[in-house]
Amino acid sequence: MASMPTISFGNLRRRDDQVEKGVLEACREAGFFLLDLRGDEVGTRLIHEIDQLFHICEETLNLPDNVKEQHQNDIPRSFLGFKPLGQAKTENDEPDRYEMFNMSQDGLMGTEPLQSLPPSLYGHLPVMISYLRHCQDIIAILNVALAKQLDLPESTFTALQSPTKKSGTVLRLLKSYASPHAEDLRTFLIHHTDFGTITLLANIVGGLQILKPGGSPLDESAWTWARPQPGCLIVNMGDAMTQWTGGILRSNMHRVIHAPGAQRFVDKYTVAYLARPERDASMKRLLNTHDVSDNEEDEGLTAWEWEVKRAMSMARAGYAPQAKEPKA
């Protein structure tokens, strides 16, 4: 099992210095940790919303195909909407085994017009927007804690990712298919790091794996299971935090494969909040470090330019979802 420390959300909200130090250590070492929502008033409300979102996720990703097709993503123009099964490839050039539906934070918050949604989702907007706001609060709390522990002004990271400004931040609903057959026991979502700042992941069934520090993604023994825990979010750092801190905070490689044990016989539903910087935020490093490896050329880019560059790199490698084939 992956070594993921558990951080108390209640103590973090109270700005406990030792808890904040624990967050920094986790983000430097593994880049992943569990955020325990239990025993806290706000955390309890979050748990209730997550339970509702799991039902919404299942309902949405089991809509008829003709409904999904009306709201399918339009790659490369837009990644919003449904990503169908098999649209991306794994490391063995096999089709992926997951579907997802991406909703823009900008649309949900009113920064931009709301994207077209399946009719069933409009009635769920209040709980989705409430959850979105709670996630924004968590991100802000983590950003302040990390800035403080890095001896930066507490507003350093929050100033670069205001929820009221345009960004690539999304609320994502995912379905990973059950694996009843031997040929299903493979990679579902290829190894990758997240583009953004911080990801908040809610799931019940296993399948997420984290690469050990120093391990090769081609070495199966270097992959460790990230076990979900009741009442906890899985939190991980994204590439933007690594870029801003000159490599001090770690954006760790991870992947999704078939669930372990008997869990592989059921479909897995996941709710993810993927925070990204404001589109116009600078990707210039905020800390002077000795790491001058390969990212100096990115310092003059805006966050949007930087994300497009990374997305195109993934697309050239064949790992990103591909554009629809034109119909004959």
Indicate where each model-derived feature is located:
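Peripheral, non-catalytic segments flanking oxidoreductase cores
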Residues: 1-328
